[in-house]
Amino acid sequence: MAERIRPYRPADESTVVGVWHRAGQAAYTFLPTWQQFTLGEAHQVFQQVIVSHCELWVATREALVVAYLALKKSYIDRLYVDPPEQRSGWGSRLIEHAKALYPEGLELHTHQESLGARAFYERHGFVAVRFGISPPPESAPDVEYHWRPNADIAMRVRGE
């Protein structure tokens, strides 16, 4: 099975937006704005906000995009895995890719209620540094996480 991480291409747009929309709908059942977010709106946001401001990477299996990562330098803006592909290592591969690109450290925000995402990031050495509220339209409680390479080393030494 040919699996790889590669840079995003414009031809990936429909597949990537579909992954993002499906994963968001499944993950954010607690956010009314997400449940009302249409695929058409997702395409608009993707073009206006994500493609124009982020470095994009996709994870593929047999040339099919199954996950994507959007970075604003060392800030993980988005990381989504298609629901049928979740818990298959794609998110971990993308996190490791981001760590290789930005070995000095990474930051991200996720929703406080996203317990699965929070556990995932914490398993990868991210530490919660601030609790707050996400910007509109969500305006939901969020958590800011940081990863620093020395934290990973300390976790390995302690056997975590």
Task: Indicate where each model-derived feature is located.
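Conserved beta-strand in the GNAT
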Residues: 58, 63-80
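Conserved GNAT acetyl-CoA-binding A-motif
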Residues: 101-113
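Conserved N-terminal entry element of GNAT/NAT acetyltransferase domains
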Residues: 1-11, 151-160
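Conserved GNAT-fold acetyl-CoA-binding loop/helix
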Residues: 13, 18-46, 54
